[in-house]
């Protein structure tokens, strides 16, 4: 698909989406605060309360380190991206330092349940199943699934699938869950990280890659020779911060913070600083959720 066609595709893909929630990062990813760094012996989730985080002077936030423009490490070794921008503001308003902990999609829940992180800001789509294991705060972005393929073999439908072909997914994502439930006969190639999935796709190991539509659209815009033939697959969802199940003090603070940030249009500023170069400004209002209010755009 030619470059000038991308605006119409992106508009169709994103205006129908409900809400996007992004993730945020910090300054280091090798350390976590002492409190809550290991799982309880009985297997129950462990977490630090809001006061404990304040007393420690550091909040541990799980973010992606390889998913540009949402969460990635730049050439200077610094975390950048939409989620990182938000994470730094959380730390600033809480009055603590941010310790960024690199996470993969498959271990987001585990990192919360074992106390490795206090908050996950890593493109975490809200689903009923996940909500049984973690507590989601109010959303800050809209998202649905999308499928990208090569220009010379554009995939526009998953019906009548060739059994010899496969689709790449990242383990622990909604794309994996959706395809297993709705297209059980389609072979899946599963990878643990965005980077390994991207490399495999570029090497031609599968004919398509399914992921959040914002991510596959960004990939196609940034890499010649690829088209998002399915810009919206399944239902529209939202992305939100997540904390350990039962950590009400931290959850309530984050929800109040999201409302306060909405009054200054913080997530629009975040978008313009981190996502505008990829998606442009025309889609800002359809992607951003302010104040946790999905229908307030």
Per-region residue spans from a language model:
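Short helix-initiation/N-cap motifs at beta->coil->alpha
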Residues: 99-110, 171, 189-203
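Flexible hinge/capping segments at coil-to-helix
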Residues: 149-166
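C-terminal motif of bacterial Sec signal peptides marking the signal peptidase cleavage site
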Residues: 20-24
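A ligand-binding cleft/hinge motif common to bilobed small-molecule-binding domains
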Residues: 124-132, 180, 202-203, 207-236
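Extracytoplasmic small-molecule ligand-binding "clamshell" domains
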Residues: 36-123
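Periplasmic-binding protein-like
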Residues: 142-149, 217-258, 278-297
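Ligand-binding clefts/hinges and TM-proximal coupling segments of bilobed small-molecule sensing domains
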Residues: 27, 40, 44, 174-191, ...
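Extended ligand-binding regions for polar small-molecule ligands
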Residues: 26-28, 34, 38-39, 84-93, ...
């Amino acid at each position: 698909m030619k470059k000038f066609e991308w605006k119409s595709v992106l508009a169709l893909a994103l205006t129908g989406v409900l809400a996007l929630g992004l993730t945020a990062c910090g300054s280091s990813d090798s350390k976590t605060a002492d409190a809550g760094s290991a799982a309880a012996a009985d297997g129950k989730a462990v977490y630090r309360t809001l006061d404990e985080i304040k007393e420690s002077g550091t909040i541990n936030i799980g973010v992606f380190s390889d998913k540009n423009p949402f969460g990635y490490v730049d050439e200077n070794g610094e975390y950048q991206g939409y989620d990182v921008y938000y994470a730094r503001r959380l730390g600033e308003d809480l009055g603590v330092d941010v310790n960024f902990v690199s996470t993969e999609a498959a271990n987001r829940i585990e990192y919360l349940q074992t106390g490795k992180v206090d908050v996950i800001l890593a493109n975490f789509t809200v689903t009923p199943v996940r909500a049984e294991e973690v507590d989601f705060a109010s959303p800050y972005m809209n998202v649905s699934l999308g499928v990208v393929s090569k220009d010379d073999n554009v995939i526009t439908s998953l019906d009548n699938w060739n059994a010899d072909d496969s689709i790449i997914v990242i383990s622990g994502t909604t794309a994996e869950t959706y395809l297993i439930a709705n297209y059980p006969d389609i072979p899946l190639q599963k990878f643990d990280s965005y980077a390994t999935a991207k490399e495999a796709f570029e090497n031609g190991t599968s004919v398509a890659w399914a992921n959040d539509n914002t991510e596959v659209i960004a990939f196609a815009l940034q890499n010649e020779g690829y088209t998002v033939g399915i810009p919206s697959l399944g239902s529209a969802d939202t992305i939100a911060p997540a904390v350990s199940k039962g950590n009400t003090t931290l959850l309530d603070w984050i929800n109040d913070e999201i409302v306060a940030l909405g009054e200054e249009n913080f997530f629009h500023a975040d978008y313009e600083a981190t996502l505008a170069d990829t998606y442009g400004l025309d889609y800002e209002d359809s992607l951003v959720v302010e104040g946790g209010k999905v229908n307030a755009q």
